[in-house]
Amino acid sequence: MFRPARYEKDEYEKLIEEIEQKNIDFMLRQKERFPQSNVTLRTGVYYVTPECMSASYAIDVANYARQKVDNDSKCSVRFYDDEMQKRRTLENQIVNEMKEAIEQHQFKVYFQPKYSIKNREITGAEALIRWERENGEVLSPDSFISVYENNGKIVELDFYVFETVVKYLAKNQKEGRNQVPISINASSLHAMDSQTITLYMDILKKYDVDPSLVEIELTETAVVSEYESVRELFDEFQLHG
């Protein structure tokens, strides 16, 4: 929806109500026609300003706002505002800077110990990632993981983290230190590639690290149609570990 105008707060609220009502009316009509269907509508709104670069830009940012509608939200409408503009700019930077960030090792892996109160000892660790950007800004996983999940680049980042952890284990092994298993998150998108296990095992062999020292935890992002593939991948990880 596009309108070249400025709106006060009460006008925004009124417009939201109008769009929401149109969405509800449409869903009710579809429910009558297709009783077994489950129709959900999401609407993104961008107000065209004199600074708008093109119609395609307006459509892109309105669609971006639509994609940001929370599945659990009672409101199915999102406005493309200044805050969303900042978020979109950051996401574009996150996508464009990934290759360089990996090459320059800007993604840092830290280890959070798992401590057994009963045995009073460290029984393992969890690998956590932070992005220490060239400008000094530190980004938490919440800032970039979902972006890479959406464009598929999360697979490349997962392998980067995995190899970083394996290299750390190999270094400890060479120095004769006690080893504990380290758990690493991996996207369910790996289930779409039949070579995933081979690629992970190749990294372990490259550094001569025992597979039992690495625990793979698949993130819960798979849809129902992917569940079986994800389960099979998880079973294969367990088999090799």
Regions found by a protein language model. Give the residues of each.
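Catalytic/regulatory signature loops of cyclic-dinucleotide turnover enzymes
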Residues: 58-81, 97-108, 135
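Alpha-helical scaffold within the catalytic cores of cyclic-nucleotide enzymes
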Residues: 13-34, 61-63, 161-171
